[in-house]
Amino acid sequence: MKMRPRYSVIASAVSLGFVLSKSVMALGQPDTGSLNRELEQRRIQPEAKPSGELFNQAAKSPYTAQYKQELKFPLTQVQILDRNNQEVVTDELAHILKNYVGKEVSLSDLSNLANEISEFYRNNNYLVAKAILPPQEIEQGTVKILLLKGNVGEIRLQNHSALSNKFVSRLSNTTVNTSEFILKDELEKFALTINDVPGVNAGLQLSAGKKVGEANLLIKINDAKRFSSYVSVDNQGNKYTGRYRLAAGTKVNNLTGWGDELKLDLLSSNQANLKNARIDYSSLIDGYSTRFGVTANYLHYKLGGNFKSLQSQGHSHNLGAYLLHPTIRTPNFRLSTKVSFNHQNLTDEQQAVTVKQKRKINSLTVGIDGSWNLIKDGTTYFSLSTLFGNLANQTNEKKHNAKEDFQPQSHFTVYNYRLSHEQILPKSFAFNIGINGQFADKTLESSQKMLLGGLSGVRGHQAGAASVDEGHLIQTEFKHYLPVFSQSVLVSSLFYDYGFGKYYKNSQSLAQSVKNSVKLQSVGAGLSFSDAGSYAINVSVAKPLDNNIDNADKHQFWLSMIKTF
């Protein structure tokens, strides 16, 4: 008789575990994969904007005295000479010279001709090119013009930072030192890439060289903020591990002098049911600003709420490495290429029913991302990536309890895209619109699924409300910027989000009563009060416009506060 209550408890737990394992989609039970995806949302970095025009070297016409009756003469030939008085082939100037040769010209006309030649070369990448009318005697209508394209003279470095002189030299050797002339695109690329190095501020200064037609380059580098840290709190956590999350982190730049960066982030939920630690170290490895990095991530969780009786918990270890290369750097266009490898060990268990599942995932991702100042006062952002993955799946569940589509080994491919545009409007207004999505070739493990909810998705739903194999998200936002105090900005916004997708790529094993598709949409408003580099307070409220998620909240209130040091 004493054994019956014990048997009843175990039988109930096993029955509950079986029902829950078959109803993950409906109840949305978090696991290591989905929780890692939720944490990835908070690590999304602001997209880098192109800097805009760096050098504006329009040639100015020299002052020429104007007379009522200027002396004119027939121009029969124009000889273009370099700084060594050697004649230069002028085929590329034919469209300019035809407007003067064979006509009567004055000194003012010749001055305009020299200025047009200067403009032509400056518009064709010769940053400091200049055409000059030297003193001369004009014979038989032949005029000589001295063309100085701007040879590279002395390159000097004033380095008052922790950045290595050798690295700066290697970077200059792949840009400004690749030509005998000061080329605008190479100088711009050098300026942009060296200012991309974390922890330094760099400036360039051109001056006249010792020889005729030469320009000296002075590179000034100073330390920016080498050490920084932050603390933050938000309510973006999962209701089963704790809604409120406390995070802290630190970043150190230029530890070795090669533009390296060390980042450490720690996070815990208010109930300590979710703990996460992440470290990321990267360094520049060549004169082309290619960056190599390694990452490590640890997560541990314990579920409460409806899953507390199952004693559900789990942990994951992630190790990764990546290569990031600035493929194109111009003032109005940025393109980066990234190749990354990631190894994941994921473990989930329900101790009450002694069920444990382990997954090992190896993945290789190849992608590009960039931004483009295509429209005046507007920036377009884009990214494309393809992930090739291999999954090794282990479970101690009995065969009749396991999912019908369970496979111990599988390969999968995931395609992601993102396209958005930010447009500045008059009166301190702005409008943002964006679309992003994911395609897959087969049903995915939870760590590879796309989250339709959360702050990076449909903001009227929690992040774990819907995770899909294939999905698409459209977001629009109307903003207003109001300067407050000396350096703070108050941003108010109205937004609309719409997302849709399929829970499973392959739905053959699903019961006919199970709905495989989902659509979410919401509207909301937000306020952000911030001082760049000091603090930020973000508040938003969003209301769902659908009833496609069972037991969904009537609205979502999002709050985050961060203080940087």
Curated annotation (Swiss-Prot):
Q: Which PANTHER family match?
A: HEME_HEMOPEXIN TRANSPORTER PROTEIN HUXB (PTHR34597:SF1), SLR1661 PROTEIN (PTHR34597)
Known role: Likely functions in the release of soluble HxuA from the cell.
Q: Which cysteines are joined by disulfide bonds?
A: none
Q: What is known of its domains?
A: Probably a beta-barrel protein.
- Record-annotated POTRA domain positions: 73-150
Annotated GO biological process: monoatomic ion transport; protein secretion by the type V secretion system
Where it sits in the cell: the answer is: Cell outer membrane
Per the UniProt entry, the signal peptide is 1-26
Extract one GO molecular function annotation from the record.
protein transmembrane transporter activity
Alphabetically list the UniProt keywords: Cell outer membrane, Ion transport, Membrane, Porin, Protein transport, Signal, Transmembrane, Transmembrane beta strand, Transport
Q: Which GO terms describe its cellular component?
A: cell outer membrane; pore complex; type V protein secretion system complex
The entry's protein name is Heme/hemopexin transporter protein HuxB
Family (UniProt) = Belongs to the TPS (TC 1.B.20) family.
